[in-house]
């Protein structure tokens, strides 16, 4: 089991190309409630975004076929994070949106159509 975990971590580290800074790890470990709250919000937003794509582009059958199970999966992740938070006595509450996502969304084209969809999908992949 440990060999497999080491192998999985090595695969992940190879993919990321850079080591996570120790300061970030220490900050995250010292702020688990905030980390979990942020994670819950990210899962909720991912589910909502997938549902919004289904609503906005119902004529794109392939997109709908991909987004429906994605929305379901992200909502399940949301529920799992909420359960972990409850076990730890952490209350799900509002969280100030990050500037990172807001700044990315400023670059989405104002045109409707495929260009806007592509911009939104690229930003979703980045986030």
Model-derived segments and their meaning:
Residues 1-127:
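Non-heme di-metal
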């Amino acid at each position: 089991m440990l060999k497999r975990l080491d192998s999985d971590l090595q695969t992940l580290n190879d993919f990321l190309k850079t080591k996570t800074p120790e300061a970030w790890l220490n900050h995250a470990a010292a702020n688990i409630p905030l980390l979990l709250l942020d994670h819950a919000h990210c899962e909720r937003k991912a589910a909502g975004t997938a549902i919004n794509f289904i609503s906005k582009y119902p004529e794109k059958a392939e997109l709908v076929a991909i987004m429906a199970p994605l929305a379901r999966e992200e909502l399940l992740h949301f529920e799992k994070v909420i359960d972990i938070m409850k076990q730890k006595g952490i209350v799900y509450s509002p969280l100030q949106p990050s500037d990172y996502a807001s700044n990315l969304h400023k670059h989405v084209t104002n045109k409707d159509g495929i260009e806007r969809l592509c911009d939104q999908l690229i930003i979703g992949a980045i986030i």
